[in-house]
Regions:
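Nucleotide-activated donor-binding/catalytic signature segment of Leloir-type glycosyltransferases, i.e.
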Residues: 247, 253, 257-261, 265-301
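Membrane-proximal helix-turn-helix segments that form the acceptor-binding/catalytic region
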Residues: 75, 82-90, 108-111, 115-119, ...
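A short, active-site helix/loop in glycosyltransferases that binds the activated sugar's phosphate group
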Residues: 152-193, 349
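Acidic anion/phosphate-binding donor-loop and adjacent secondary structure
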Residues: 3, 32-34, 180, 195-218
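Conserved donor-binding/catalytic core segment of Leloir-type glycosyltransferases
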Residues: 169, 204, 213-231, 237, ...
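A conserved catalytic-core segment of Leloir-type glycosyltransferases
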Residues: 7-79
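Nucleotide-sugar-dependent
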Residues: 231, 287-305, 310-329, 339-350
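A charged, aromatic-enriched C-terminal amphipathic alpha-helix characteristic of glycosyltransferases
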Residues: 362-370, 376-408
Length: 408
């Protein structure tokens, strides 16, 4: 396509050999300490050298970290923008860069992008993964000036992106909506053009397109990904107690499988309280199988396709209105029924309903209990919902971006 990417990143990841990849240590003392620990661990392991060097560096940097916190109060990542800006400025001035593309999660990438745009005038494209402004409740539009200095700076940075980026996009309708409310200059002349891009996902490894599902003696409900107290399987275990009281046979037939992350404390407590150690099975992270040679990702895909129903936990924080779990895009490729427990996100609900999914409202115990009962009854009849197969690939994201950035 005639595009030669030059990648800037932190030093903590693996260096990409396909194209120029510059890895920078952050210059601030707190971020330097963080990056240094990961760099030493990757290079020498976590043995004697790691312990000696990291403790020494921590002691030497301690007073400077305290000064940084008192003077600025930002999260440590901010200082990564300094080397990224300097290197980027040099590449731009020597004619090696035509467009800056800032991608974050980490807001320091956007900060470096804005600096480069303002100093050089280069075209800036920004992709915002997570909300920069965290709202507290449905009535909070995000106008209030945060007391926390890091949050206050992120508020300012969002306004900078909406003003100086040539194009800026978010991953959900909700995220774009609230950004536009706070930044009415968005999509106006001499400001950024903002829109929504659904990231999608490539088909998972070892995906079997015509997988014929086999019903077994157990109803297997499977969750993949991270868990936390605000995104917990305990809500399903609570519903299971009610289901077992109504259908005692369900106690021996239902199994809940958790892959990829440790259990959260609420789930652990619910297991102990209800004696569900044989019901909820924590498999942890699936790694490469030395016997079959299958990668961890391939094994995960197989487990997804073997599931009777895939569990999608959305969370309970207000920012769920601006967030769609990336795991959904992997789920959609498997062709298995999804049970989504969602929170204040009409776009996500519509996506699930269009594909014939089970749907519950986070925090609504009766809604969750009703969905679990329906799944149980459907499984007994071997009539689980047959999803409408509409996976979302990355090709549509590319088409969407091109439709916005190319001259009309």
């Amino acid at each position: 396509a005639g595009i030669q990417p030059i990648v800037f990143s932190a030093i903590t990841g693996i260096k990409d050999q396909r194209f120029p990849h510059h890895q920078f240590l952050a210059w601030g003392p707190a971020a330097f300490r963080f990056d240094f620990r990961h760099w030493v661990a990757n290079k020498y392991g976590r043995g004697f050298i790691y312990k000696l060097s990291t403790r020494t560096v921590s002691l030497l940097l301690a007073p400077f970290i305290a000064i940084e916190k008192l003077a600025l109060g930002y999260s440590s990542q901010w200082s990564w923008a300094l080397p990224a800006f300097i290197r980027g400025y040099w590449l731009i001035k020597t004619g090696k860069v035509d467009v800056v593309y800032s991608i974050g999660s980490a807001w320091s990438a956007h900060l470096a992008g804005v600096w480069l745009k303002r100093v050089t005038g280069i075209k800036l494209i920004s992709e915002v993964h997570d909300p920069l402004v965290i709202r507290k409740n449905p009535n909070d539009q995000g106008f209030e000036k945060p007391k926390n200095r890091d949050a206050r700076f992120r508020h300012y940075l969002e306004s900078q992106l909406c003003q100086y980026s040539d194009f800026v996009w978010w991953f959900t309708d909700g995220a774009l909506h609230y950004a536009k409310v706070r930044n009415p200059q968005l999509n106006r002349p001499n400001n950024a053009s903002g829109f929504v891009v659904m990231p999608g996902a490539e088909p998972p490894g070892s995906l079997q397109g015509k997988f014929n599902h086999v019903y077994t003696n157990h109803l297997n409900l499977c969750h993949f990904g991270s868990l936390a107290n605000d995104r917990s399987l305990s809500t399903i275990l609570t519903a299971l107690v009610s289901l077992v009281n109504k259908y005692p046979k369900a106690r021996k037939c239902i199994q809940i499988h958790a892959y990829g992350a440790p259990l959260d404390s609420l789930t652990i407590d619910a297991i102990k309280k209800n004696d569900f150690s044989d019901v909820l099975l924590a498999h942890g992270r699936l790694e490469r199988d030395p016997l079959t040679g299958k990668s961890g990702r391939e094994r995960v895909t197989e487990k997804m396709q073997e599931a009777d129903v895939l569990i999608l936990l959305h969370g309970q924080d207000e920012w769920c209105a601006e967030y769609i779990p990336s795991k959904l895009y992997d789920y959609l490729w498997t062709g298995r029924p999804i049970w989504g427990i969602t929170h204040r996100n009409p776009q996500l609900d519509q996506m699930l309903l269009e594909r014939r999914s089970y749907l519950s409202v986070e925090g609504d115990e009766s809604s969750i209990a009703m969905a679990l009962e329906r799944i149980w009854l459907d499984w007994q009849q071997k009539q689980l919902l047959k999803p409408v197969y509409m996976p979302i690939g990355v090709d549509q994201a590319v088409s969407r971006i091109l439709s916005e950035v190319l001259p009309k």
